[in-house]
Amino acid sequence: MAEKILMREGRLIIPDRPVIPYIEGDGIGRDIWSVSQKVIDAAVKKAYAGQRSIQWREILAGEKAYELTGTSLPNETLEIIREHLVAIKGPLGTPIGKGHRSLNVALRQELDLYACVRPIRYFKGVPSPLKEPEKTDITIFRENTEDIYAGIEWEAGSDEVAKVISFLQDEMGVVNIRFPESSSIGIKPISEEGSKRLIRSAIEYALEHQLKMLTLVHKGNIQKFTEGGFRKWGYELAKEEFATELAEGTLVVNDIIADNFLQQILLAPENFQVVALTNLNGDYASDALAAQVGGIGISPGANINYQTGHAIFEATHGTAPDIAGKDLANPCSLLLSACMMLEYIGWKEAAVLIIQALEDAFINKNVTLDFAKILDVAHQSTSQFLEVLIDSI
């Protein structure tokens, strides 16, 4: 009988047949989810000889939710994730500059999924622009709930922005808004609590995985109290809570300016292991790093609250509506995110089977169209790629 995943005394309780909600996603979401579900089920069945299985429960968000319920993110979806703790999702679209709230950001904020975790590693056989892509093996911890993603901004010419600018000028003595009559204004909240819980999770991850280097990436040379605060609070936390590890040398904490970090991950990526960043810097850096190992089409991601146990594992790329329904999509981002999910619930053996199947496919140049064009080889359709993986498992 299927049961819910529970959190007790800070630990996940995983039944042999957990119920895991999924969001199919927009665009190519249906294409890549149907493949991913079959691969996950096959790996779990093989790894545990049929003694474990996942009962999938569809929940709605995005276009499908809007068509069926009139809203893109129904309250029921949020409640089901809260109740079941762990979920997985395909890509969700948000119109640019239309005033619509990003569904991805909404999920993270509504569920307080404060850590965006993106492990970036190279798989042999995947096309990369770097000569030595195998040197890139970095796990990103991006703060997920603060920074400019809080969505506190006002449009140029609005009554609201006029009030904000007037307050800044009249009450706060601000004189360096260059064009106040035509400026939009945004606010960037960065808190001690938000920074420390993210950095704490990054350090705990590093120690759990026998990685001793944690790097704080920031723009504190310009934004002294927000980005600079992130850096300051990170060092404070390390000294307060991990003094023994620092003294023993099992943990080393350092920091780097964000623009220099983007240079160094190209010049010397081997110098970084686990990296903690504020929200916007993390957004830039995670996709830049993904490009070094094959792109976001093969980049997994998870949004996690380590305190409550809630987690959503997701495809990190867009909806690619131009190839939706054409059997051309690359499911690797979602599959690797599924591997993260399996590891999160302690089913590492199943995750290993999927990763091994992907590694074999890449080495043998059994790849989808996006990689095939770069490698100049015949491509596998999405459904053919599924068959390759199932045969390997």
Describe the residue ranges of each PLM region.
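N-terminal glycine-rich phosphate/adenylate-binding segment common to multiple enzyme folds
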Residues: 65-171, 184-185, 280-284
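Buried hydrophobic positions in well-ordered alpha/beta secondary-structure cores of metabolic enzymes
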Residues: 26-29, 85, 141, 202, ...
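Glycine-rich phosphate/diphosphate-binding loop of Rossmann-like nucleotide-binding domains
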Residues: 15-16, 21-37, 47, 163-256
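N-terminal beta-loop-helix "entrance" segment that forms/cooperates
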Residues: 49-73
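Buried hydrophobic packing segments
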Residues: 36, 40, 234, 334-342, ...
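Flexible, glycine/charged-enriched surface loops at secondary-structure junctions
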Residues: 49-55, 209-218, 243-254, 347-355, ...
